[in-house]
Amino acid sequence: MTTCSICNESEIKYKCPKCSFPYCSLPCWKIHQSQCETVNDNNTTTFKGVKEPLNPPEPSPNVIYVNGRIPSLAEEALPSESLLESIVEDPSIKNLIESNAELLHIMKELVNLDREEEGSVPLKTLDAIQQQRLHNPSFEKLASMILEKYYAQK
């Protein structure tokens, strides 16, 4: 036997049609009705006394939150100009890109996509890079070479 969540005395006989909260009688339903509300934006119902507000995630040390919502990379997470130059000038990386026409085409598309994006975090570009890493072995090899060089000099 499950007792009513409002009066804690009688057995449950009914459930709220809006949120399925169990109650036993009309007086308990009236008490519950004052605490039950429908949220109109997505037609969901909540019970005021039960749900806790969602807390935002803890910020990562490498992410700066602007207005509490828009992340951008912290300066220390970005590669230095000298590191970028050494990666671009690396003979093995240059050779891999120049010897693979498809890879050269992908790199040009990614550069163009990055130039078109606005904001501090190029989400479309990052998504495109991830897709290429998943579906293109040559691109994965290039990404691995760049990351090895990046972490070797960090």
From Swiss-Prot:
UniProtKB keywords: Metal-binding, Zinc, Zinc-finger
InterPro entries membership: BCD1, Znf_HIT
GO terms for biological process, alphabetical: box C/D snoRNP assembly; maturation of LSU-rRNA from tricistronic rRNA transcript (SSU-rRNA, 5.8S rRNA, LSU-rRNA); snoRNA localization
One Gene Ontology cellular component annotation held by this UniProt entry: pre-snoRNP complex
Positions with a binding annotation for Zn(2+) 2: 16, 19, 32, 36
ZnF segments: HIT-type: 4-36
A GO MF label: zinc ion binding
Binding positions for Zn(2+) 1 per the UniProt entry: 4, 7, 24, 28
Source superkingdom: Eukaryota
PANTHER family on file: BOX C_D SNORNA PROTEIN 1-RELATED, ZINC FINGER HIT DOMAIN-CONTAINING PROTEIN 3
Identification of the protein by name: Uncharacterized zinc-finger protein C4F10.19c
Species this chain originates from: Schizosaccharomyces pombe (strain 972 / ATCC 24843) (Fission yeast)
Lineage: Eukaryota, Fungi, Dikarya, Ascomycota, Taphrinomycotina
